[in-house]
Amino acid sequence: MNENLFASFATPTMMGLPIVILIIMFPSILFPSSNRLINNRLISIQQWLVQLTSKQMMTIHNNKGQTWTLMLMSLILFIGSTNLLGLLPHSFTPTTQLSMNLGMAIPLWAGTVFMGFRHKTKAALAHFLPQGTPIFLIPMLVIIETISLFIQPMALAVRLTANITAGHLLIHLIGGATLALMDISPSTALITFIILILLTILEFAVAMIQAYVFTLLVSLYLHDNT
């Protein structure tokens, strides 16, 4: 195992060049289009998951919000697949990098805010000042609402980064403890190994849940601005 606890989060390189782009593009291979594979089990599962998720997320949207369906479904598939691939041994999880998550969160958030100011200008501006606010609290509330608006993409990115990173660190620590206890106390090592298996199963669920939460929050931001 790596001596450095955070070595697995370092950006991988090949011949001195970062290969993050190749890693990010790899999930697209896992979801081939139906033009190449017809009546394939993978395609059937993919379509069923997309339809189920789109029904849950997009029913609250109007016609303008429905135009984001393809983007949001692509987003949840991308984040979910990269999270799951990161659980494989000796692999790299791009979503543990805050810079990448900010690169996804900021443009999506900015797009929803832009739509709000473009199509519902008065309603978008009204969010900065709740109805019935006392006059002496108006400047403070405007500042607070402005800060809360700009914190939204940071919260999206930090939530995804923290949850995925914490899970990987726990797996790393428990895996290291299991190896260290094999020679000292095999019975204790067996217990920690069982805990490691259960934690890994939990991390598979967390990987999908975090992809769903990230996409759902973007969908809610979109709903507030359309």
UniProtKB/Swiss-Prot annotation:
Record note on quaternary structure: Component of the ATP synthase complex composed at least of ATP5F1A/subunit alpha, ATP5F1B/subunit beta, ATP5MC1/subunit c (homooctomer), MT-ATP6/subunit a, MT-ATP8/subunit 8, ATP5ME/subunit e, ATP5MF/subunit f, ATP5MG/subunit g, ATP5MK/subunit k, ATP5MJ/subunit j, ATP5F1C/subunit gamma, ATP5F1D/subunit delta, ATP5F1E/subunit epsilon, ATP5PF/subunit F6, ATP5PB/subunit b, ATP5PD/subunit d, ATP5PO/subunit OSCP.
Family: Belongs to the ATPase A chain family.
Pfam families: ATP-synt_A (PF00119)
InterPro entries: ATP_synth_F0_asu, ATP_synth_F0_asu_AS, ATP_synth_F0_asu_bact/mt, F0_ATP_A_sf
Keyword Ion transport: yes
GO MF entries: proton channel activity; proton-transporting ATP synthase activity, rotational mechanism
Reactions mediated catalytically: H(+)(in) = H(+)(out)
Lipid bilayer topology: Multi-pass membrane protein
Segments traversing the membrane: 12-32, 68-88, 97-117, 135-155, 164-184, 189-209
Disulphide bond pairs: none
GO biological process: proton motive force-driven ATP synthesis; proton transmembrane transport
NCBIfam families hit by this protein: ATP_synt_6_or_A
UniProt keyword annotations, A-Z: ATP synthesis, CF(0), Hydrogen ion transport, Ion transport, Membrane, Mitochondrion, Mitochondrion inner membrane, Transmembrane, Transmembrane helix, Transport
Record bears the keyword rRNA-binding: no
Its job: Subunit a, of the mitochondrial membrane ATP synthase complex (F(1)F(0) ATP synthase or Complex V) that produces ATP from ADP in the presence of a proton gradient across the membrane which is generated by electron transport complexes of the respiratory chain. ATP synthase complex consist of a soluble F(1) head domain - the catalytic core - and a membrane F(1) domain - the membrane proton channel. These two domains are linked by a central stalk rotating inside the F(1) region and a stationary peripheral stalk.
Record-given protein name: ATP synthase F(0) complex subunit a
Main location class: mitochondrion
